[in-house]
UniProtKB/Swiss-Prot annotation:
Signal peptide: none annotated. The keyword Amino-acid biosynthesis does not apply. Cell division inhibitor that blocks the formation of polar Z ring septums. Rapidly oscillates between the poles of the cell to destabilize FtsZ filaments that have formed before they mature into polar Z rings. Prevents FtsZ polymerization. The gene is minC. This is Probable septum site-determining protein MinC. One of its GO terms (biological process) is regulation of cell septum assembly. Interacts with MinD and FtsZ. InterPro entries: CAP/MinC_C (IPR016098), MinC (IPR013033), MinC_C_sf (IPR036145), MinC_N (IPR007874), Septum_form_inhib_MinC_C (IPR005526). The keyword Cell division applies. PANTHER family: SEPTUM SITE-DETERMINING PROTEIN MINC. Belongs to the MinC family. Pfam families: MinC_C, MinC_N. It comes from Vibrio cholerae serotype O1 (strain ATCC 39315 / El Tor Inaba N16961).
Length: 220
């Protein structure tokens, strides 16, 4: 006997594209350039579009088509200023989303730390579910290391490191030599060109402060 499906609420960490104007071509070009820098990270990733700062009408069908052609999946719009803007978004196939402050939840039971003693090669992906990840070697360009907790890399990070993958904003990324393609905590990320030169090839720690990423050098 088949069982009925169950519909429950849940929460997810999604990338948010903040528009500053209604110039769709410029937005699509920006996305294409960013995705080209880390295609594996962005491939078929869901994205929410924040239109709170946009003045004037938005060509929502063109926006949706452009985002899709860039390789992302547009799932919704937030920040609509009036009902008309909401209706235009819905007609184009967007969900209209409202940001809310969720009540604090008890932290999940953390799993034992996952330790990798060998180099992480290009094309490999290592994931520490519900726990921290320790890499005792290097992470090559094209490799990806992910943890729901923090990530410690006792070598060079040339690939991508994604900590707090399930939304844990207290997560950290610590590495002995930063040359990353991408670093991310709880959905916030920097590509290589966003990392200030003073931190390049240095021993560093990445954390989140007031919803923004914060990078500092370590002297120990």
């Amino acid at each position: 006997m088949s069982k009925n499906p169950d519909l429950k609420g849940s929460s997810f960490t999604l990338s948010v594209l903040h528009l500053s104007d209604n110039q769709i071509a410029h937005t699509v070009q920006f996305l294409q350039e960013k995705i080209a820098q880390a295609p594996a990270f962005f491939a078929n990733a869901p994205v929410v579009i924040n239109v709170a700062k946009v003045e004037g009408d938005i060509d929502y069908p063109a926006l949706k088509q452009g985002i899709s052609q860039a390789g992302l999946i547009p799932v919704g719009v937030t920040g609509c200023k009036d009902k008309r803007s909401q209706n235009l978004a819905v007609e184009a196939g967007f969900a209209v989303m409202t940001a809310t402050n969720s009540p604090a939840q008890a932290p999940a039971q953390m799993a034992p730390t996952k330790v990798i003693r060998t180099p992480v090669r290009s094309g490999q992906q290592i994931y520490a579910k519900d726990g921290d990840l320790v890499i005792l070697s290097h992470v090559s360009a094209g490799a990806e290391v992910i943890a729901d907790g923090s990530i410690h890399i006792y070598g060079t990070l040339r690939g991508r490191a994604i900590a707090g993958a399930s939304g844990q904003r207290e997560a950290r990324i610590i590495c002995h030599d930063l040359q990353a393609e991408l670093i991310s905590i709880a959905g916030r990320y920097w590509l290589s060109d966003q990392i200030e030169s003073q931190f390049w090839q240095q021993r560093v720690m990445l954390s989140m402060t007031d919803e923004s990423l914060y990078l500092e050098t370590l002297t120990i």
